[in-house]
Amino acid sequence: MGILSLTLKFKKNFIPFLFCIMNVNLTAHAETQKTNAKWDPTVLGFESPQGGLLGDMYGLRPALENAGFHYSLAYVNEIAYNAAGGYNHDKEASYIDQVSLTFTQDLERYTGIPDAAIEGNIVNRNHDSNLRRDRLQDSRALRTDESQESWGGQSITRLGWLTFSRSFDDRKLHWRIGMMNKLQDFDQAIGCDFQTLNLCGGKSANSGWWYNWNSYYWGTVLKYDLTSELTAKIGVMEQNPEMGSRRRAWSLSSDGSKGFLLPMELEWRPMLFGKLPGIYNIGTQFTNSPQADLSEGKSGYPGAIDADGYREYHRSWYFSTAFNQQITQKDDDPQRGMSLFSSLAFSDQRSNYIRYSASSGIRYRGLFDLRPEDWIGAGVSYIKISNHYKGNLNYLNELNNVSDYSNPLYNPIPDHSVTAEVFYRFKITPWFELQPDLQYWYHPGGIKETQAAWVIGLKTSLNF
C-alpha cells in the first residue's frame, strides 16, 4: 500500500482514535512475565553515547568523570529540500544547526545526600531557515508541523535548564527544583530522532504552555516510584510565554509569568513478552493562566467585533498519552530489533487551535547484519484543528465579504493535516551519523487548497 493510499485513509476523522485503541489494546493484552533480562531502552530509540570525536581529551574527560562531572557535547544540523508540491514551488534547501552541552555534576559523593546532583543544558542554535514557513505552507495559516524539528526561529545561545535534584525514602521519592525543562522528567516515552516535529518526542508540548527543549521555567517536581516499574509524577512550574524570547535566554527573572502550570503523569516501564522493554505514560496539564477563546467574545458577541475582546478562561486542561514498545529482538541481541510507538493528545479547543494530535510509527535497529547499528524509522502524524478557531476564521471572512482563496484578505480555513516520514540512519563511526529522510505533507497547515508536498531531508549528528 502506497503513501497516497495511507493518506486517503487518514482523511477520516476517526483515524486518530485508532491510535488510542491501539494503545489501550497493546497495554491491556500484553502480560508482564518474570525475567532476568535487563531493561535496555536502546531499541526504543534511546541509544547510549559510544564515545566522542575528541576521545578522552588527553585525560581530561576521565579526570572530570572521576570528579563526578559527566557531559555530552553534540552537534546536529538539519537540511530540508522541497522536491515537489507545497504552497510555493520555488526550490529551496533550508539549513539549521545547533550545538548542545548537557551535563550532570554528582554531589552525592561529596555530601552523602542520596542522588544529589546538579544538571544543566546550554544550547547554541543558528539560522532562521525554515522550509515549512518559506515553501510548504500558506503563510496565512498557523503551523501544524515542521520539516526541521530543531528550528528555533533565531540564532541564539541560551540556557536550557539548571536544576538541583536529590532523593528521599530509600531512593523512591525524587525531588527536583530550579530552572527546569519538561524533558527532564515528563513525556519521556518517545525519543527525538525523526526530522519532522510531530514525530519527534511526545505530544505534551502541543498544549502551547511549555517548550520541548532549550527553554526553562522556574519550578519543582516530585516523582515517586510506586513499584520498580511504575512512577507517579507531579510538578509546579511558572506558565510564562516570555521564556522563549531572546531577552530571557539567561534571565533569572520570572517577569512575564501569567500563572502556574501543574503537570501530572503516570509512567510505566515494564518488560513485556518475557524480555522486551517498553515505556507507557498518561498525563495531564492544568494551568490557571488566562487563555483567550479563539472565537467567542466576553459580551457574548463574536470576539472579532466584541468591544470587550475575546473571552478568557483561567482553568484549562490538556491530556496526552504515549507508548513505545520493543516488539522483536534479532538474534538474541537485546540492542537489535523493532519497536512500535504511538502518541495521542487532546486540548481545550476553545483556546488551543490544535484540537487533537496523534502520531504512530516504527523503528528498527540493526536490520542488516553488515550494519548492526544502523536505524530505519517510519511514522505518520495527524493534526485536527479546533472548531472554535475555524469558526472565527469563517466569521472574519464573512465580515470582510471575501470567499476567494486567492484574495489576500481571505483567511484559509484549516481542518486537518497529515505528515509522513521515512528515514535511514547510517552509523558511520561511534560519534558520526548521517540520516537521510523522505517526508510527505498532505494539507500543509491543514489547508486543503495547498498542494501536497514531498520533502527530502538530511540530518547530521556529531558527538564530541
What are these regions (language model features)?
Residues 31-32, 54-71, 106-118, 169-172, ...:
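Short loop/turn motifs that connect adjacent beta-strands in outer-membrane beta-barrel proteins
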Residues 62-64, 77, 105-109, 165-168, ...:
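Residue-level signature of outer-membrane beta-barrel architecture
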Residues 96-241, 352-356, 367-394:
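Outer membrane beta-barrel
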Residues 452-464:
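Outer-membrane beta-barrel "beta-signal"
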Residues 71-79, 118-124, 175-181, 234-238, ...:
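Transmembrane beta-barrel strands of outer-membrane/channel proteins
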Residues 32-84:
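N-terminal regions that are enriched for targeting/export leaders
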